Design a protein with these regions (language model features):
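A Zn2+-metalloprotease active-site environment signal
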Residues: 6-17, 24, 28-257, 265-288
Length: 288
């Protein structure tokens, strides 16, 4: 992937090495890890458990006090993340008005190590990358890319770019008004249906990542041989069925929150081929 040619984003905040702020006011790292593992075992998004615990302890109010370094990081992986974010900004600032008649407001990207605070509560490396709609920010510990390579054998710069573009896809969903409606609905239904709604949200973000890649390649010729295979392999490696099989030896479809390997590969490919937001409407699709 020719990411070196991308414009770097100014919407990056680097908190790596800073640790958690606020000391006694927030959840401890051990608590965050336990809640993350509990969410994984129960099929519940860990961010829901952590965010709830933050509100109960009064620890969610101080996250804005943490300020990291602004601007383009100097290390290679930091520059990579900044460049991919910049390219998503360039793509969506054109595609969203053209296809959805909405102006694109770019999200922020926070790089952290181990743990930090977000508008949605505590963020811990074990949770993986995530998007917080409350502060319209993507959070990622870049060591996740090393874990992708080590644990899932899913490395490569375009595979890593797909992960970032997926989280930006959630921001696009938020700008389209989809996330607030889904979250409201999830509070009204049972766990199985709430999980199914989560799967639709995640698969749409996979597809939107494909839409970004389609237009990035069309405009900048950014993809190189093998890149698409890298991303599809990554999508396969992080499917709920595959992860559950690895971690607990069995698959529980009702607890899926992101979609199966087959679904994630198929929706990413749909976005790559179509380049259209409309093609990513998982909420009206007869087949997920």
């Amino acid at each position: 992937m020719r990411w070196e040619d991308f414009r770097t984003s100014s919407n990056v905040e680097d908190r790596r090495g800073m640790g958690l702020p606020g000391g006694a006011g927030g959840l401890g790292i051990g608590t965050i890890v336990i809640l993350g593992l509990l969410g994984w075992a129960l099929g519940i998004d860990p961010r829901i458990l952590i965010g709830g615990a933050e509100m109960m302890t009064g620890g969610g109010s101080g996250y804005q006090q943490q300020q990291g370094r602004q601007g383009t990081p100097q290390d290679e992986m930091g520059r990579f993340a900044s460049a991919v974010l910049g390219n998503t900004e360039d793509v969506w600032s054109t595609v969203l008005p053209q296809q959805a008649n909405r102006q694109y407001q770019a999200p922020k990207l926070v790089l952290f190590s181990d743990a930090t605070r977000s508008g949605c509560g505590g963020a811990q490396s074990a949770m993986g990358p995530f998007y917080c709609p409350l502060d319209q920010t993507v959070y990622i510990d870049l060591s996740f890319f090393e874990e992708m390579q080590r644990r899932f054998r899913a490395g490569g710069d375009f595979a890593y770019a797909y992960v970032l573009a997926h989280e930006v896809g959630h921001h696009v969903e938020n700008q389209l008004g989809i996330l607030p409606r889904v979250q409201e609905r999830q509070q009204q239904v049972g766990r199985a249906e709430a999980n199914q709604l989560s799967v639709r949200v995640e698969l749409m973000a996979d597809c939107l990542a494909g839409v970004w890649a389609h237009h990035s390649n069309q405009r900048w010729r950014s993809l190189e041989p093998g890149d698409i295979e890298e991303a599809i392999h990554a999508a396969e490696a992080i499917g709920d069925d595959r992860l559950q099989k690895q971690s607990q030896g069995r698959v529980v479809p009702d607890s899926f929150t992101h979609g199966s390997s087959e679904q994630r590969m198929r929706w990413l490919t749909t976005g790559l081929k179509a380049g259209q937001i409309q093609a990513c409407d998982t909420f009206r699709a007869s087949r997920l």
